[in-house]
């Protein structure tokens, strides 16, 4: 039903002109917006709901200031419509759409709505309003979570089709998750939240096929294929596709580490690094190998381990062509070509190309090795054979004894 038309301006009972008011006085008729029947028919359901809420809120503000006056016919109409638009009510236009539309048509309609500039007024509902068995949740009750049935039936590529948009929700209309109890203002937000419980990823990238549980995550991912990097670091000039990635990168320059471990106090610059570090204390190994069943705490460790089964060596040396399973192994190998030795011994200062060689070399500095360290009369006086009570030398001692010699 269309709202009432704009009332005629009140007239002075003693004269022929309009009623006199104090300068600066404002009435509801001065700020209200009225639509004729034809204009009202052009509005979408969400726009109509927004109009009703704004008019009711405006009249409430004027009444609080004591200038509301008698209740206008428009407000009486809004209150009558509010009863019809309860949480269980359905838009008449939505009721006409009982069959699922083609996903391509839905995407075209969505683009058309964005061109009309109504994106800020509407919130898409990823579940078709006419889907059988779909009801708006009223109060928590036993049974499967809201939207669970529809999620299993949703198409695997693209966003589930839309028939029409629901009205803009009010503050008292909250949609609760029956799994964890969280509540949301938008029903579509609740449905996307339920995907986190089911593990379903219905939003697929048309370029690479990767799936996402949220439409916003897919939108951010698409920027990678478009090559967009709008967020640039002012320190080094490096650009990123997402603002959050730039924020994390800036901590490299500032040295900020806001995430601290409650068990050992170690601090990290990213929350994901802290989350993975916590597995060191909990002993959690959630990433098992599908071939041998061995579990790992980090997905990167699992990927490296899987290469021992497949024999894959994806990191070739550009100098000699030798391939390695890990990039760190290839980087250490390249030092044999460049002669770089970045790891010094803290006791004698001798430098090595690999950190493991430093650890093996430090065995000669062990306490109680016997003999006077240093060169005497042109020869090495340190005893290279283990003494009584010494720990066994590392394996590399027999293979590479030259790395255990001390510098004079």
Curated annotation (Swiss-Prot):
One of its GO terms (cellular component) is nucleus. Residues 91-167 are annotated as: Disordered. A zinc finger (C2H2-type) spans 175-197, 203-225, 231-253, 259-281, 287-309, 315-337, 343-365. One of its GO terms (molecular function) is transcription coregulator activity. The keyword NADP does not apply. GO terms for biological process: cellular response to glucocorticoid stimulus; regulation of transcription by RNA polymerase II. Residues 26-97 form the KRAB domain. It is found in: Nucleus. InterPro entries: KRAB, KRAB_dom_sf, Znf_C2H2-type, Znf_C2H2_sf, Znf_C2H2_type. The KRAB domain and the zinc finger domain are both necessary for the regulation of NR3C1/GR transcriptional activity. Zinc finger protein that functions as a cofactor for steroid hormone receptors, such as NR3C1/GR. Directs NR3C1/GR transcriptional activity toward specific biologic pathways by changing NR3C1/GR binding and transcriptional activity on the glucocorticoid-responsive genes. Interacts (via KRAB domain) with NR3C1/GR (via NR LBD domain); the interaction regulates transcription factor activity of NR3C1 by directing its actions toward certain biologic pathways. Belongs to the krueppel C2H2-type zinc-finger protein family. This is Zinc finger protein 764. It comes from Homo sapiens (Human).
């Amino acid at each position: 039903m269309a709202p009432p038309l704009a009332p005629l301006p009140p007239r002075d009972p003693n004269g022929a002109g309009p009623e006199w008011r104090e300068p600066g006085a404002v009435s509801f008729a001065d700020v209200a917006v009225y639509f004729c029947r034809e204009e009202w028919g052009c509005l979408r359901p969400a726009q109509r709901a927004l109009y009703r809420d704004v008019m009711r809120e405006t009249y409430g503000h004027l009444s609080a200031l004591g200038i509301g006056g008698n209740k206008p016919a428009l407000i009486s109409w809004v209150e009558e419509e509010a009863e019809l638009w309860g949480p269980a009510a359905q838009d008449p236009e939505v009721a006409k759409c009982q069959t699922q539309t083609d996903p391509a048509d839905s995407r075209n309609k969505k683009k058309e709505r964005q061109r009309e500039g109504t994106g800020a007024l509407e919130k898409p509902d990823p579940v078709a309003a006419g889907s059988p068995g779909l009801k708006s949740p009223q109060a928590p009750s036993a049974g499967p979570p809201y939207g669970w049935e529809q999620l299993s039936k949703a198409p695997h590529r693209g966003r589930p089709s839309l028939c029409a948009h629901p009205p803009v929700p009010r503050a008292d209309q909250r949609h609760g998750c029956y799994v964890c109890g969280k509540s949301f203002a938008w029903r579509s937000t609740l449905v996307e939240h339920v995907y986190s419980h089911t593990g379903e990823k219905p939003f697929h990238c048309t370029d690479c096929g990767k799936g996402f549980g949220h439409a916003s995550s897919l939108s951010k991912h698409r920027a990678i294929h478009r090559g967009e990097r709008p967020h640039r670091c002012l320190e080094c000039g490096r650009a990123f596709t997402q603002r959050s990635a730039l924020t994390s990168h800036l901590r490299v320059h500032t040295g900020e580490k806001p995430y601290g471990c409650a068990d050992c106090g170690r601090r990290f610059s990213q929350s994901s690094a802290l989350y993975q570090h916590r597995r060191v204390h909990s002993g959690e190994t959630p990433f098992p190998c599908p071939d041998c069943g061995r579990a790992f705490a980090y997905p990167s460790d699992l990927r490296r381990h899987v290469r021992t089964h497949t024999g894959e060596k994806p990191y070739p040396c550009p100098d000699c062509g030798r391939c390695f399973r890990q990039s760190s192994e290839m980087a250490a190998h390249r030092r044999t070509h460049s002669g770089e030795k970045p790891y010094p011994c803290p006791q004698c200062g001798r430098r090595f190309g690999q950190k493991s060689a430093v650890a093996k070399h430090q065995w000669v500095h062990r306490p109680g090795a016997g003999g006077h360290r240093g060169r005497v009369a042109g020869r090495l006086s340190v005893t290279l054979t283990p003494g009584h009570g010494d720990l066994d030398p590392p394996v590399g001692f027999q293979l590479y004894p030259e790395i255990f010699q001390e510098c004079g």
